[in-house]
Amino acid sequence: MPSTSRAGSLKDPDVAELFFRDDPEKLFSDLREIGHGSFGAVYFAHDARTSEVVAIKKMSYSGKQSNEKWQDIIKEVKFLQRIQHPNSIEYKGCYLREHTAWLVMEYCLGSASDLLEVHKKPLQEIEIAAITHGALQGLAYLHSHNLIHRDIKAGNILLTEPGQVKLADFGSASIVSPANSFVGTPYWMAPEVILAMDEGQYDGKVDVWSLGITCVELAERKPPLFNMNAMSALYHIAQNESPTLQSTEWSDYFRNFVDSCLHKIPQDRPTSDELLKHMFVLRERPETVLIDLIQRTKDAVRELDNLQYRKMKKLLFQEAHNGPAVETQEEDEEQEHGVGRTGTVNSIGSNQSIPSMSISASSQSSSVNSLPDASDDKSELDMMEGDHTVMSNSSVIHLKPEEENYPEEPDPRTRPSEPQSPPQVSRHKSHYRNREHFATIRTASLVTRQIQEHEQDSELREQMSGYKRMRRQHQKQLMALENKLKAEMDEHRLRLDKDLETQRNNFAAEIEKLVKKHQAAMEKELKLMANEEKKFQQHIQAQQKKELNSFLESQKREYKLRKEQLKEELNENQSTPKKEKQEWLSKQKENFQHFQAEEEANLLRRQRQYLELECRRFKRRMLLSRHNLEQDLVREELNKRQTQKDLEHAMLLRQHESMQELEFRHLNTIQRMRCELIKLQHQTELTNQLEYNKRRERELRRKHVMEVRQQPKSLKSKELQIKKQFQDTCKIQTRQYKALRNHLLKSTPKNEHKAVLKRLKEEQTRKLAILAEQYDHSINEMLSTQALRLDEAQEAECQVLKMQLQQELELLNAYQSKIKMQAEAQHEREIRELEQRVSLRRALLEQKIEEEMLALQNERTERIRSLLERQAREIEAFDSESMRLGFSNMILSNLSPEAFSHSYPGASGWSHNPTGGPGPHWGHPMAGPPQAWGHPMQGGPQPWGHPSGSVQGVSRGSTMGVRNSPQALRRTASGGRTEQGMSRSTSVTSQISNGSHMSYT
């Protein structure tokens, strides 16, 4: 539930279901106050529905800090609803009425501290073991559910009629473990709780420490440092050694158990589960040890209440017969009895810094619960008290069960002369019936004294409550600041992560855009290459067709010309017969036609070879051009990735610096606030100590003034006592004088009687004068002695008080100095740890950057390697195919763009790198341009009449054919392939990285 909700508001359904809506005043009757504390009061009551006896703890949530009180009530109710164990108090419900919460629980007889209060002596070891065992079982249950009680003491360990031990008062409990609140009762508080805000968190082992202190309390009637101011006790616990059992009569098991519980370092302290296995609680003991103890205590309570009753009857009887002027021995006796009953008060009270706590360890509850948790005597449940206590505003009349039914009946054992009481049997039945409803181990005087102290010591309680409130407020401020800075840090980290993610997304989009651009460029280039190849092939075919037509026309002309020449030759040679001429002419024509057919076939073959060769060359050049383009695109993409990675790493370093600066600023802010809060806390502690010193001195002065005022009465009493002694002496002397006179008168003659009487009279007068002088001297000596003794006693008390207060002030200064040193050491440690974390984070970041750069470089190398390998495989496959088709690599790679431009206009422009890269990709140019197809043979064939010309022409054609044959291609390529392969494999990465293309020539 949010702390800002109004106190008592039930709008939140989670809160509303914690409380019953019935009117508690109609459900519970016969309410009798049986305990009191800063939280409110505890009442005995009957449940009208079931006639069950219950205890009701009334807690107001109005007035100052109402919201905090309301939150504490909610927390306690939630805690009680969560627990269910035989050794924890049974919760029955909670009701709301007029800004007061009625917390209903099972009724118990009283607390372990009530046992000490009644018997005025420590418990036996087996009794302590039994109580401790039950408390440990309850603590083990709480700790197993990550719950912490935080206020274990004898006053919060209750006992039931069957001897069951119950843990009670969960107003200080914590629902989470570990916790870090300043909560508990000072004398029982563990060191880590006192230093919670300064040194960190604590867990259920704080209850183990409190249990150890409780064992000391049960063994010595009060906890350690109980004669010290509560605030001073806190400082002492925080910085001094752990307490131990003082007496040597206790067993080694008990001593070891207490020492184990009171280990100063929590890590060395055993858990509640481990302590359940300790021999101190496992040793064999009578099962009825607690039942017997409770019965003895109930009997003692009955006797004490009977004694009070008899005193009251005696006072009333004396007033009725002798008037109110009866003082002396009875009064003194009553005072002595009062001292006996409240021995803890009188023996400790003068040194007790918190008078409200000076009753006994049980009432000693300036419980430092977080605020109203501070149930002073949250013997909440002791609540559960005994004989009927009839409350009338501030007066309390505590009646025995018998007296409730027979108010005028005297005790037959102490007043035998009184009238006969009703039959004993009926009285026992009545007593049993009332005990069944309101059995208790608390005396009426304890309840009355508790209420009176609560009314009187509000100033001290308010000071402690204010100190606890301040500590809790400081903790809230520090937690609020830490949460604020944590939120700021998370927001800053999210912003940086968002910036980094945005940059990465932008980079990814840029890379994706670049890849798509490259894909489009590659597709465009492939289409362009296909078109260029088609155009190139068409251009060569058109040129060859033109050359073929020209060649055929030339052959026709040559044929016609040759035919005419042959005719002329035949006409000139008249001697040859006509038939022979015709035969010779036909044969010449046939030879010439055959020669022309061969020439045409050779031309077509050469054209086909040339077309295939040039197309193969063109394809190879296109392949190399595509490879160059791929290299350019890959290089551009890799360079882009490198640039992006550099920018990303620069941003990571900037973000690291930004986070480092923010972390140091936050740490400085927290440490500065912590120092301010410690300074304010120390100032408050010093102010409280000085106020406490003034109050102690004021109380001592008031006491001395009262002693001085009461001195005349005391002197008058002593003077009357001396006067009485003098009167007794005078009476004795008078009797002696009369006896001597009678004796002398009998033994002396009658005529001498007058002289004897005169002499005796003078002797008597002289002795009375001496006695009067002694009386005056005794009075004067008594007056001077008493005044001197009073002055000396008061001066000694002043000196003792000053020394004690000075020691407490020095203890406070030492504690504060230690806290300051610890805070400084903690701050230095935090700065050192932050520097280590930052440097480690920087080293990890630099390592990550280095790894990413190495991974990027490896990726770059792998991309280039795989690209070049793929391109090499493509070139090799192309060259293998070319070799299979009969083309040599040398021939394919020895065509210069200039030579190519003669036969293919526009090709030279295409041969340039499409991406603007370096020009020459194709290896070595050819030695010279190819001969025009229109002049296949220099000089032409010889006239048909000269066969040598034809032979020469054929030999040239055959030479051309041999040069273009697969065998020749293989021979020319055999010497250069290894060299080319080597040139491809060298400096692959550097060439692409530097922007140069690889040529596979």
Swiss-Prot record:
Residues 28-281 form the Protein kinase domain. This is Serine/threonine-protein kinase TAO1-B. Belongs to the protein kinase superfamily. STE Ser/Thr protein kinase family. STE20 subfamily. SUPFAM superfamilies: Protein kinase-like (PK-like). The lineage of its organism: Eukaryota, Metazoa, Chordata, Craniata, Vertebrata. The keyword Methyltransferase does not apply. Residues 324-435, 567-586, 911-1001 are annotated as: Disordered. It is found in: Cytoplasm. It catalyses: L-seryl-[protein] + ATP = O-phospho-L-seryl-[protein] + ADP + H(+); L-threonyl-[protein] + ATP = O-phospho-L-threonyl-[protein] + ADP + H(+). Transmembrane segments: none annotated. GO terms for biological process: cell division; DNA damage response; DNA repair; execution phase of apoptosis; mitotic G2 DNA damage checkpoint signaling; positive regulation of JNK cascade; positive regulation of stress-activated MAPK cascade; regulation of cytoskeleton organization. The gene is taok1-b.
